[in-house]
Amino acid sequence: MELQEVLHMNEGEGDTSYAKNASYNLALAKVKPFLEQCIRELLRANLPNINKCIKVADLGCASGPNTLLTVRDIVQSIDKVGQEEKNELERPTIQIFLNDLFQNDFNSVFKLLPSFYRKLEKENGRKIGSCLISAMPGSFYGRLFPEESMHFLHSCYSVHWLSQVPSGLVIELGIGANKGSIYSSKASRPPVQKAYLDQFTKDFTTFLRIHSKELFSRGRMLLTCICKVDEYDEPNPLDLLDMAINDLIVEGHLEEEKLASFNLPFFTPSAEEVKCIVEEEGSFEILYLETFKAHYDAGFSIDDDYPVRSHFQVYGDEHIKAEYVASLIRSVYEPILASHFGEAIMPDLFHRLAKHAAKVLHLGKGCYNNLIISLAKKPEKSDV
């Protein structure tokens, strides 16, 4: 089965769906000030046609209500900054392209658009038709838009997904090289970590080169992804998956060869690795780069626009929160895991993951690191 066929969130609106488990959480809330600053710099740059129509893309948008909450933040930031900077009575039209792979559940987003537009008009004063939302399916490691047609590209929790499993893992190192793990973890051998870093370097370089061509000169890009830091000693969500899978092997429910032959196309870079790749590729100037921590159960925070899921108790002990963590991780990773390990074992897998999450939460741990980077496309020499 092709990777792009299984690299998507759980579809629909069931208890294990991404739509029901993802939420506007504290991690995304921390991004909003950076988003506003990025929009402020964008509007000051006075790019072509920006006063009439601002063209934006959300790369790796996923599905469900959370997608439109990101769109809401972008629209609110544009309107807020526009009023502060230019005090314009006539707001520019905002055209937003939602991008993800072809198998993404775009329909779950489209169904929410009528109510989203009405709410935007009621709360932001944006008339229906002044914010245009459409889909642009396809891999963001390939071209999506015409040259010099976009003002702002946004991506949150997507660029850590690779275009493929590092080829060197199996071809050069052999099956089972990454023993006991499904990704490039702290426990992985140096050759495995290098194979993953090489693939990320190749993919992220391609990402920057391709999308720099789609942006106007001095256009902006804001990226957020999970990252690693040297002193970080807490298990992240993928470490919990490793623990749960190894439990099933020890208990005899899963063959060790199944784990040995599976590697997730996912890499958590360090801030320095990202910085070096951007500088080496050369199309962008780094405006700022920061890291911040988010907690596993950050999604328990309540957003007025996001009703809390009824099948979870918002306030409770570690076991209740651990169930939420397990369901959220399941909604993201189940399709690709089920394609390799089988659907039948998924309930047991995430039941064990919840137990490990509860232990981590009980110890007062359970954070993962995030990286946010703001980039400006360097002007061509003729534009200087």
Swiss-Prot record:
<feature type="binding site">
    <location>
        <position position="161"/>
    </location>
    <ligand>
        <name>theobromine</name>
    </ligand>
</feature>
<feature type="binding site">
    <location>
        <position position="18"/>
    </location>
    <ligand>
        <name>S-adenosyl-L-homocysteine</name>
    </ligand>
</feature>
<feature type="binding site">
    <location>
        <position position="160"/>
    </location>
    <ligand>
        <name>theobromine</name>
    </ligand>
</feature>
<dbReference type="InterPro" id="IPR005299">
    <property type="entry name" value="MeTrfase_7"/>
</dbReference>
<feature type="site" description="Involved in substrate discrimination">
    <location>
        <position position="343"/>
    </location>
</feature>
<keyword id="KW-0949">S-adenosyl-L-methionine</keyword>
<dbReference type="InterPro" id="IPR029063">
    <property type="entry name" value="SAM-dependent_MTases_sf"/>
</dbReference>
<dbReference type="Pfam" id="PF03492">
    <property type="entry name" value="Methyltransf_7"/>
</dbReference>
<feature type="binding site">
    <location>
        <position position="66"/>
    </location>
    <ligand>
        <name>S-adenosyl-L-homocysteine</name>
    </ligand>
</feature>
<protein>
    <recommendedName>
        <fullName>Monomethylxanthine methyltransferase 2</fullName>
        <ecNumber>2.1.1.159</ecNumber>
    </recommendedName>
</protein>
<feature type="binding site">
    <location>
        <position position="156"/>
    </location>
    <ligand>
        <name>S-adenosyl-L-homocysteine</name>
    </ligand>
</feature>
<dbReference type="GO" id="GO:0032259">
    <property type="term" value="P:methylation"/>
</dbReference>
<comment type="pathway">
    <text>Alkaloid biosynthesis.</text>
</comment>
<dbReference type="GO" id="GO:0046872">
    <property type="term" value="F:metal ion binding"/>
</dbReference>
<feature type="binding site">
    <location>
        <position position="139"/>
    </location>
    <ligand>
        <name>S-adenosyl-L-homocysteine</name>
    </ligand>
</feature>
<dbReference type="InterPro" id="IPR042086">
    <property type="entry name" value="MeTrfase_capping"/>
</dbReference>
<feature type="binding site">
    <location>
        <position position="368"/>
    </location>
    <ligand>
        <name>theobromine</name>
    </ligand>
</feature>
<dbReference type="GO" id="GO:0102741">
    <property type="term" value="F:caffeine synthase activity"/>
</dbReference>
<feature type="site" description="Involved in substrate discrimination">
    <location>
        <position position="266"/>
    </location>
</feature>
<comment type="similarity">
    <text>Belongs to the methyltransferase superfamily. Type-7 methyltransferase family.</text>
</comment>
<keyword id="KW-0808">Transferase</keyword>
<feature type="binding site">
    <location>
        <position position="101"/>
    </location>
    <ligand>
        <name>S-adenosyl-L-homocysteine</name>
    </ligand>
</feature>
<keyword id="KW-0479">Metal-binding</keyword>
<feature type="binding site">
    <location>
        <position position="157"/>
    </location>
    <ligand>
        <name>theobromine</name>
    </ligand>
</feature>
<feature type="binding site">
    <location>
        <position position="263"/>
    </location>
    <ligand>
        <name>Mg(2+)</name>
    </ligand>
</feature>
<keyword id="KW-0460">Magnesium</keyword>
<feature type="binding site">
    <location>
        <position position="61"/>
    </location>
    <ligand>
        <name>S-adenosyl-L-homocysteine</name>
    </ligand>
</feature>
<dbReference type="GO" id="GO:0009820">
    <property type="term" value="P:alkaloid metabolic process"/>
</dbReference>
<feature type="binding site">
    <location>
        <position position="100"/>
    </location>
    <ligand>
        <name>S-adenosyl-L-homocysteine</name>
    </ligand>
</feature>
<feature type="binding site">
    <location>
        <position position="178"/>
    </location>
    <ligand>
        <name>Mg(2+)</name>
    </ligand>
</feature>
<feature type="binding site">
    <location>
        <position position="262"/>
    </location>
    <ligand>
        <name>Mg(2+)</name>
    </ligand>
</feature>
<keyword id="KW-0017">Alkaloid metabolism</keyword>
<feature type="binding site">
    <location>
        <position position="140"/>
    </location>
    <ligand>
        <name>S-adenosyl-L-homocysteine</name>
    </ligand>
</feature>
<feature type="site" description="Involved in substrate discrimination">
    <location>
        <position position="154"/>
    </location>
</feature>
<comment type="function">
    <text>Involved in the biosynthesis of caffeine. Catalyzes the conversion of 7-methylxanthine (7mX) to theobromine and with a lower activity of paraxanthine to caffeine. Does not have 1-N-methylation activity.</text>
</comment>
<keyword id="KW-0489">Methyltransferase</keyword>
